[in-house]
Amino acid sequence: MVSNAVTRATKSELPIDPLRIVAKEMKHLTGNIRQLLGSGHPSLDRVAKYYTQAEGKHVRPLIVLLMSRATSLCPKAPDSPHTHSTATIDSAISPLDVLADVNPSSPDFSSQPESSEHDVLPSQRRLAEITELIHTASLLHDDVIDHSVSRRGSPSANHEFGNKMAVLAGDFLLGRASVALARLRNAEVVELLATVIANLVEGEFMQLKNTARDERNPKWSEDIFPYYLQKTYLKTASLISKSCRAAALLGRADATTVDNAYAYGKNLGLAFQLVDDMLDYTKSGKDLGKPAGADLQLGLATAPLLFAWKTTPELGILVGRKFEQEGDVQRARELVYQSDGIEQTRALAEDYSHQAIAALQTFPDSEAKDGLIEMAINTLKRQK
């Protein structure tokens, strides 16, 4: 079934462009996000909107919109909650004079006019924007933690404005995302995305250690890779999987469809991060748009090194001291290149990509489904 789906997606008459399928919805994404981020404090306004100036890949909202369109053709859940219109999701729940008290610049959250296309609902478009807000907030915080100096080819926010401003801007984005999320008026969707925010923090704490016990001279054990995959889910796949599930819920899809949407997002997210970890070893900083080898410089052992470690005990010493001594980073890279760690990482990413495609097999054939399949295929072809 998976091979048939891939064949159909890759042998269509015209190349599949996932972005084209939801181009109308994506067109207003950045503008709507900037409107959600309005602040009466000029400095905060500038920092909060800083990462919206450079055109990012917008992978997560693209996936949400494709999933919204693909699941619109799936069976509906009985007695599912009412899906709210643009007017409803833009209107406050609390009195406006309370929400805007001493904050006259609190945005009205107004969106672009509703499209005549009804297969992507206003609430699902807003979910795509919320997903990007949460992701951007995590970038602001991660860049502070990682002491990053660049992002998307420009100075990172922490480098441009300082750590304090970057952290506060990230917090502000999460606050705005939470308000927009509440106005979707769907308790399960709120629960899912609130859990994502907690997961991002949990994953970051797990990343402070390369192994569960964080020993100074660790030995390879079978629990090392599950620890890495759990951290990877929390930091990367949680947002993609839970936003896919939320998109299906907002579209009133039945339980099977909702579960399959989640499975697609989870497997795609894991594949995405595995490829990201692999590129850190195979591409230059110029190709990536960020420093190559950054993971090792930060003391992080990712999939290629973990696979190599299983047959190269010397890596355990380097992992234990987090590559801090002179020559450690270069030696670790050499040992990874001498192993099949990169090839095993690629194979695992392919497996997760195929599992993502398999999760879509019960979805009716559609352009959006083909777009989701193409996203899974393209994840393996990423060069940055």
Where do the PLM segments sit?
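All-alpha prenyltransferase/terpene-synthase fold signal
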Residues: M1-K384
